[in-house]
Amino acid sequence: MAKKIVGFIKLQVPAGKANPSPPIGPALGQRGLNIMEFCKAFNAKTQGMEPGLPIPVVITAFADKSFTFIMKTPPATVLIKKASGVQKGSAKPHTDKVGTLTRAQAEEIAKTKQPDLTAADLDAAVRTIAGSARSMGITVEGV
């Protein structure tokens, strides 16, 4: 028989830097889950990734105080900002442009994000990434 699910916890945790401090500790603690066990497992899985890159994670909590977690790909906005070299998006995205993104960079981001996107193919994924970049005030070349 399957375990009874008591809830889901959605967090964004920096790769390789999970520790029991907020927001991880309180979120897992109120469900009675082992915080250090999650931190060690998450840090082990994100060992090969760039340290500090925020990774969305969905933790499934079970009635017997055990858990499983699924890691998603980093948010598109973080990858776009890193590729275009800007610190933050524009306050007026359609009038003030803060950076540029080439088609090659957009394709690279789309390949990374492909598992989490609903796009049918790579070209549709690139257009999705380009739209996100434009809404941040970043000019997209070649799309």
Swiss-Prot record:
GO biological process: translation
Keyword RNA-binding carried by entry: yes
Alphabetical list of InterPro entries matching this protein: Ribosomal_uL11 (IPR000911), Ribosomal_uL11_bac-typ (IPR006519), Ribosomal_uL11_C (IPR020783), Ribosomal_uL11_C_sf (IPR036769), Ribosomal_uL11_CS (IPR020785), Ribosomal_uL11_N (IPR020784), Ribosomal_uL11_N_sf (IPR036796)
Cleaved signal peptide residues: none
GO cellular component, one term: cytosolic large ribosomal subunit
Post-translational modification: One or more lysine residues are methylated.
Keyword Nucleus: no
Protein function: Forms part of the ribosomal stalk which helps the ribosome interact with GTP-bound translation factors.
Protein name: Large ribosomal subunit protein uL11
Gene name in the database record: rplK
